[in-house]
Amino acid sequence: MRGHLVATVALGVALLAGCSEDRVPTGADPSNGSTGTGPSDRSTGPGPDESVATVATGFEVPWGLVPLDDGSLLVGERETAQVFRVVPGSDPSLLTTVPGVAPDGEGGLLGLAVPDDSAWHDGEPAPFFAYATTDTDNRVLRVEPGDGSEPAVEVVLDGIPKAGNHNGGRIAFGPDGYLYVTTGDASDGASAQDPDSLAGKILRITAEGAPAPDNPDPGSPVLSLGHRNVQGLDWDSSGRLWASEFGQNALDEVNLIQPGGNYGWPQVEGPGGEPEFIDPVVSWPTQDASPSGLAVGADGALYVAALRGESLWRVPLTDADTGTDAGTGTGTATGTDPGSVTVGEPERLYEGEFGRQRSVVTGPDGELWVLTSNTFRGDPAPDDDRLLRLDPAAQAGSP
């Protein structure tokens, strides 16, 4: 059994039908620091930091992560297609299992998104969106959990190429109300440059699956192209869209996304200086990053979850005119102006303390939430995988 109880008060937990290895995630006392055997056994840097709290443990390849305004979170598992609701201080509860998911390599149940979480405030399940791999493709689904019965699933967008690797998979509703979808090249680099393919793109669609009417090509869902495998995206207070992208063997990237922009893959990896392509604003050697999730923190910096790099990278953003942090908020997602922001020197946080980091999001109170990803690749600790909460006051000065 893979469940590991680390809460100060033991809670009775029933085994969930269909859980991998009869495993059930368990809650931890979020008021405690990140003590235990996991981080210290694996750490090659400073010891566990008390600014990080372990909130839940025992997840199996967690991927999707959505914070809700009531303080709870949704966590999806890639292999089992199970979605849990996590209330800090309690054991995660199984919300639903998404049917029709066919895990394959890096594919499975990937990103989750909620258009308006006000429907969750009464404690009842509400619809959410999911990016999932099936037997034939990757697709975006609208899932209504129901009351314990089979969930109602509606296909929003299908036909996204799938493969064992490079499936993209992050989805998020932007400040403009449209759904943004990241796709990988599905191990076919040429498809990233094909405007008629959904592979290797960032897509922008309505909640019903239609192309956003003011896309670069109004009849196409494509917002940007030339991507290898984007797995993170978020907006700053001015509505600028930032995305993290896996490189191949040389350089990983953070890009400032411009509508209609071509980011160069497979012709370019990292900065290329080619006039027809947009260079990344940040790049790292692949062994230092392999970036998955990305979030704009309450301090205005980008936070990038690194898998191979086993770190959380902090990238400062400064408004070029005022010299102040960009911060978080709302804006017009397609109104990007690359010259209005200055990107600072990346800072590596929590190196080696928690292993591979898959997802990072900013919560309603400015806290950061991080999912580890050690149960697929890596060196899992006994309580992996974990949901961690970072103290906002420590974001700018972590070890």
Regions found by a protein language model. Name each.
Residues 1-10:
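N-terminal export and membrane-targeting signals
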Residues 15-18:
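C-terminal motif of bacterial Sec signal peptides marking the signal peptidase cleavage site
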Residues 20-189, 240-247, 288-319, 335-337, ...:
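Acidic, Gly/Ser/Thr-rich repeat motifs that build Ca2+-stabilized beta-propeller blades
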Residues 45-57, 89-103, 142-162, 198-229, ...:
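Blade-edge beta-strand/turn elements of extracellular beta-propeller
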Residues 191-194:
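Short, solvent-exposed loop/turn segments at secondary-structure boundaries
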Residues 222-249:
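Repeat-solenoid scaffold signature
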Residues 397-399:
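Short, solvent-exposed mixed-charge patches
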